Design a protein with these regions (language model features):
Chain B
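Membrane-interfacial helix-loop segments of redox and metal-homeostasis proteins
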Residues: 2-375
Length: 57, 375
């Protein structure tokens, strides 16, 4: 087995996951998407981050 | 036992192949921007940039720490500190002047956070890859990283599932430096660690190679751009846990027992497309960017490393620990160390000390796990 096989399997794994998720998740809507830049948008940042404290119990 | 690294001769891709792949990548990015929204296309592109920079300049976080500990080579660690300082120079004013539009990687210091960072430091040396490093290495054909990655994701899901319980063991409020004085303290702290690294390092190891300088410029620029686009700093491990959460929910699991995954924001992300999740997109980009560099270099013909069974088993366990501990620690080298310190979070400094101590143990463990020859 060579490194190319590992890359191929990794990329296939990602593609299959994204494909399955695309089929099972809420549909995408570019007209409801946030603007390109959060900076200057006037909208609060809502993305998830690993450093965000957990929700209060 | 060490890895076999003999490269097989392979010819680099030709002009037509390279052009076709670049056109395909550009089409994919534009397609995502059109289908999901411009921000998401941009985040995938930024993630690819991170992957290109890390793999292209052979820069990272785990290797430089290893070389500092084993060889007293301070150059990589110094490059990391300079990169964080550049990000902080831009991030602090952005955070101060833009209210809710921009948020930092601010997390509380706690018992589980410190323990998590220590375990993460040890595990990343076993796998030879942190959060970004595991993704980049998997994307460039490293079998150890590719095996560790799914278990990293499972661990990240599990750590997030139990996160509220762990933080209840003892945790301070979130403490973050801000404004000019906060920036000055951050830069002074980075400089102090840099001086310490130079003093402890071998003679002339403070000289930073040109490729590290290029990596520093690229990573800092991309990290600042990420902050402006996403409104939050670069992170890695949330996305990995989300992938598993999506998988278990698709298989019928009920996550209402987890305060973390049942929280409205996280529950919403489980049902939303992964193509709208910030960290997932940059994670995909890291893998894709690294794969592109590896293919471009014609470096995919090398055989994968040969290790004993116990080494592969160790990689699986270390992968699980990487994921679980990084959630307890509120981030990996990227989310906690790089972005935490770069946006003023005190937990980033504590994370650095704990993870560096853990790295020392991880390096000592590698020979006993069959991942390298005993010295």
């Amino acid at each position: 087995m060579i490194r190319g096989h590992v890359v191929f399997l990794t990329l296939i794994g990602v593609a299959v996951f994204v494909g399955l998720d695309f089929a099972n998740s809420a549909p995408l809507n570019p007209y409801n998407a946030p603007p390109l830049f959060s900076l200057g948008s006037g909208l609060a940042a809502t993305g998830a981050h690993c450093a965000a404290p957990p929700p209060a119990q | 036992m060490s890895a076999t690294t003999t490269a097989l001769p392979s010819s680099p891709p030709g002009f037509m192949s390279r052009s076709a792949v670049l056109v395909a990548v550009a089409a994919m990015l534009l397609g995502l921007a059109m289908v999901a929204g411009p921000r998401y296309g941009a985040l995938l592109a930024i993630g690819m940039g991170f992957g290109l920079a890390l793999e292209g300049f052979r820069f990272g976080f785990t290797g430089p720490w290893r070389r500092m500990i084993l060889n007293r080579d301070a150059s990589g660690l110094l490059a990391q500190l300079i990169c964080i300082a550049i990000v902080a120079l831009f991030a602090f004013p952005m955070l101060a002047n833009n209210g809710a539009e921009i948020k930092g990687a601010h997390a509380p210091i706690g018992l589980a956070m410190i323990g998590g960072a220590f375990v993460f430091g040890a595990s990343m040396q076993i796998v030879m890859g942190c959060g970004s490093g595991t993704l980049v290495n998997a994307g460039s054909g490293n079998a150890v990283a590719a095996l560790a990655l799914p278990f990293f994701a499972i661990g990240s899901f599990g750590g997030a599932y139990h996160l509220t319980w762990w933080t209840s063991l003892g945790s301070l409020p979130v403490i973050a430096l801000s404004g000019t004085s906060g920036l000055a303290i951050t830069l002074a702290g980075l400089a102090a660690i840099g001086v310490l690294a130079i003093l402890l390092g071998a003679r002339n190891s403070w000289r930073i190679p040109a490729r590290y300088w290029m990596a520093v410029a690229a990573l800092a620029g991309l990290a600042i751009l990420h902050l402006a686009v996403a409104g939050q700093p670069w992170g890695v491990v949330y996305g990995l846990g989300l992938w598993v959460a999506k998988g278990v929910v698709a298989m019928g699991a009920d996550l209402s027992g987890s305060p973390f995954w049942a929280a409205p924001g996280n529950a919403e992300r489980i049902t939303a497309s992964v193509l709208t999740d910030v960290t997932s997109l940059t994670d995909f980009g890291l893998i894709g960017g690294a794969a592109l560099v590896a293919w471009w270099r014609a470096g995919l013909g090398s055989p994968i490393g040969k290790y004993p069974l116990r080494a592969w088993a160790s990689v699986i366990i270390a992968g699980l620990l990487l994921g679980y501990s990084s959630r307890l620690a509120f981030g990996c080298n990227i989310g906690a160390f790089f972005s935490g310190i770069g946006t003023g979070s005190l937990h980033g400094w504590v994370w650095f000390v704990a993870a560096f101590a853990g790295s020392w143990f991880g390096i000592k463990l590698r020979p006993f796990l069959g991942l390298e020859s005993r010295r």
